[in-house]
Amino acid sequence: MVAVIIKGNEVAEKKRAQLKEKVVKLKEQGIVPGLAVILVGEDPASRSYVKGKEKGCEQVGIYSELIELPETITEERLLVEIDRLNGDDRINGILVQLPLPKHIEEKAIIERISPEKDVDGFHPISVGRMMTGQDTFLPCTPHGILELVKETNLDISGKHVVVIGRSNIVGKPVGQLFLNENATVTYCHSKTRNIKELSKLADILIVAVGRPKMVTADYIKEGAVVIDVGVNRLETGKLCGDVDFDNVLDVAGYITPVPKGVGPMTITMLLHNTVESAKRAGVVCQ
């Protein structure tokens, strides 16, 4: 058996085309979806991510506004900027690019964003709604992972999902999303004693730990869906995931590559949330 490769870039393009059609219809009603991105400092990786978000907005017709602030900005001044955007009817989504400088408390910044504009899905109210199965903005990477698994046409209900990783951004929320789909979910992390044995029980294995090629064929149940969230740069400069792709390819049923796997879906789900926020707000732009 050779695994089917789930091409996240192709799935993302298909979904962006659908979003573009939705944006056209909203604009016919006088509604223009708007996303504000706050970038603090000059971190090259953060700037690269922001450019990807701007490009995505342009692709589907979303108005985007980039607010660039110096690394020396105070937490109080940043909170004032968020308050301004909370009150701006042109803006349906607010995203603060993380990480922030050490003197700024990320928790305080995230909690200041209006839940109605929390298109990253990080606000505690958004998280609580997700946990209880209510309609809310889902966190972008976990939502993208769920959509990729749905592309396999696998019936998620009753399946065993194993998540390796417990970050607040990916690991914890992605398990909850699959629980909401009636899967049975097992979390593994650095203190789990028998990760390999547990992984081998997974119908769907999601790996998000930041360790290059950690997961090999002996972690994989034959025919399993393997979702690799990791992005690691080797000494050669080549990107690789947390899964040893070539080693696992002959055991898995489906697998995402790195790059062009989960990554393109993250920004696409951000665009999805921004469009949904605009629909809910229904504010006609003058």
Swiss-Prot record:
Pathway: One-carbon metabolism; tetrahydrofolate interconversion. The lineage of its organism: Bacteria, Bacillati, Bacillota, Bacilli, Bacillales. Its EC number is 1.5.1.5, 3.5.4.9. Pfam families: THF_DHG_CYH (PF00763), THF_DHG_CYH_C (PF02882). It catalyses: (6R)-5,10-methylene-5,6,7,8-tetrahydrofolate + NADP(+) = (6R)-5,10-methenyltetrahydrofolate + NADPH; (6R)-5,10-methenyltetrahydrofolate + H2O = (6R)-10-formyltetrahydrofolate + H(+). Coiled coil: none annotated. One of its GO terms (biological process) is tetrahydrofolate interconversion. InterPro entries: Aminoacid_DH-like_N_sf, NAD(P)-bd_dom_sf, THF_DH/CycHdrlase, THF_DH/CycHdrlase_cat_dom, THF_DH/CycHdrlase_CS, THF_DH/CycHdrlase_NAD-bd_dom. It comes from Bacillus mycoides (strain KBAB4). Disulfide bonds: none annotated. One of its GO terms (cellular component) is cytosol. The gene is folD. One of its GO terms (molecular function) is methylenetetrahydrofolate dehydrogenase (NADP+) activity. NADP(+) binds at G165, R166, S167, S190, V231. Keywords: Amino-acid biosynthesis, Histidine biosynthesis, Hydrolase, Methionine biosynthesis, Multifunctional enzyme, NADP, One-carbon metabolism, Oxidoreductase, Purine biosynthesis. Homodimer. Catalyzes the oxidation of 5,10-methylenetetrahydrofolate to 5,10-methenyltetrahydrofolate and then the hydrolysis of 5,10-methenyltetrahydrofolate to 10-formyltetrahydrofolate. This is Bifunctional protein FolD. Belongs to the tetrahydrofolate dehydrogenase/cyclohydrolase family.
